């Protein structure tokens, strides 16, 4: 694997001053240029902002945080390509067949994106991605030494 695709729950832990120490410690040891976001993560921020009442002062705070995140990851925000979407379809079908439950769309889209770009998927949602075929790293509980980067 050449890098890390960060799920929204990882970003939340990193930017929250009370976020999980294990997540913060792991991230502090990584080369940030090897960290990527999916456009879906920015979309999840947009969804959260739009769920707030129009006069909620947090709309501005969360909007500024979302914009700062997009700027910080400039050039490292991955779009959904045709290959990612086709891989997502295959993953979703296999996971549903294996578990008898339809997997969460965003989690399996992230898994497909990670596979397409040779990245570890960094998430706490291991249960939702375990049959995806993606290499999944949970910074809340996994040993980082078991997830080496191979270089670009």
Locate each region found by the language model:
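Residues at the C-termini of beta-strands that transition into short coil/loop
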Residues: 39-40, 81, 125, 140
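Acidic, PIN/NYN-like endoribonuclease modules and their adjacent C-terminal/linker elements
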Residues: 109-111, 115-152
